[in-house]
Amino acid sequence: MDRVLSLGKLPISFLKTLYLFSKSDIPAATLPSMAVALVLAAPCSFHLIIKGFLWNQLHLLTFQVKNQIDGIDEDSIAKPHRPLPSGRITPGQATLLYRVLFFLMWVAAVYTNTISCTLVYSIAIVVYNEGGLAAIPVVKNLIGAIGLGCYCWGTTIIFDGGKELHGLKAVAVLMIVGIFATTGHAQDFRDRTADATRGRKTIPLLLSQPVARWSLATITAAWTIGLIALWKPPAIVTLAYVAASLRCLDGFLSSYDEKDDYVSYCWYGFWLLGSNILPIFPRLRGELP
């Protein structure tokens, strides 16, 4: 009986392991990309939403598993709850999992007609994880932005019944890429100790803390103003969006502690989520096809 119960727990344990691989990217990758897809696509069925979510998570997990295989030492300091440093899975098992996920990712691409998106994404994650470009701060942000853009691109296509992006929909996804390319280093403030241990050269380590934080604040404020002007949300939504931006920036500017930076990064995720759902207002006004 105990053996049967133990076997019954394996699927739950495996799902928890997958969740722990992607947990830290839920605020800044999963939620924003799902939100923007729901906003940009025409109203869709629950079946398409589940299909898009699984495609989204399959692509995210493929990147995260390989990235965490290469970053065990770093994660043992900054994120000990992750599957590899906590011992839930061995490096060998994780490598096998990565290969299976990569294969399934391409099966999903063929099945959902998102081959172009998955091709761009595959090139991006390979050059990021295996090409050594993650060590170059500006390139790291750009590739991260391309990855986020691909999550939005592919998920939107699935939600929209296979239609390719065009017009304001394409503009919205390009805005997401631009936002993350210029502000994505917000995630690196919380990992300074681990990044320094691993020898990574992130923007928060290359620049002084005041310069790194105030430049992030300036860019984020500029995007906030620009997106409000572009998408023209109602006044109450504008106030809420600005409030999220100010809370995020106040956190980064008022404390340099990495624990506080983790909280500020969560607020950054909410601000990014807000940035991604603002195109709903052109849709409500009938400006999106």
From Swiss-Prot:
Topology in the lipid bilayer: Multi-pass membrane protein
Induction of expression: Expression is controlled by the fumagillin biosynthesis cluster regulator fumR. Expression is also under the control of the developmental and secondary metabolism regulator veA.
Cellular localization per UniProt: Membrane
Transmembrane region(s): 35-55, 95-115, 142-162, 165-185, 222-242, 262-282
GO biological process entries: fumagillin biosynthetic process; terpenoid biosynthetic process
Keywords, alphabetical: Lyase, Membrane, Transmembrane, Transmembrane helix
Entry keyword annotation includes Chloroplast: no
GO MF annotation list: lyase activity; transferase activity, transferring alkyl or aryl (other than methyl) groups
Catalysis: reaction(s): (2E,6E)-farnesyl diphosphate = (+)-exo-beta-bergamotene + diphosphate
Record pathway: Secondary metabolite biosynthesis; terpenoid biosynthesis
Tagged with keyword Ribosomal protein: no
EC number of the protein: 4.2.3.211
GO cellular component: membrane
Recorded phenotype for the gene knockout or disruption: Completely abolishes the production of fumagillin and decreases virulence.
Signal peptide: none
Pfam families membership: UbiA (PF01040)
Biotechnological relevance of this protein: Fumagillin and its derivatives have been intensely studied for their potential use in the treatment of amebiasis, microsporidiosis and rheumatoid arthritis. They have also interesting antiangiogenic properties by the irreversible inhibition of human type 2 methionine aminopeptidase (METAP2).
InterPro entries: Prenyltransferase_related (IPR050475), UbiA_prenyltransferase (IPR000537), UbiA_sf (IPR044878)
Family: Belongs to the paxB family.
Job of this protein: Beta-trans-bergamotene synthase; part of the gene cluster that mediates the biosynthesis of fumagillin, a meroterpenoid that has numerous biological activities including irreversible inhibition of human type 2 methionine aminopeptidase (METAP2). Within the pathway, the membrane-bound fumagillin beta-trans-bergamotene synthase af520 converts farnesyl pyrophosphate (FPP) to beta-trans-bergamotene. The pathway begins with the conversion of FPP to beta-trans-bergamotene by af520.
Protein name, entry field: Fumagillin beta-trans-bergamotene synthase af520
Organism of derivation: Aspergillus fumigatus (strain ATCC MYA-4609 / CBS 101355 / FGSC A1100 / Af293) (Neosartorya fumigata)
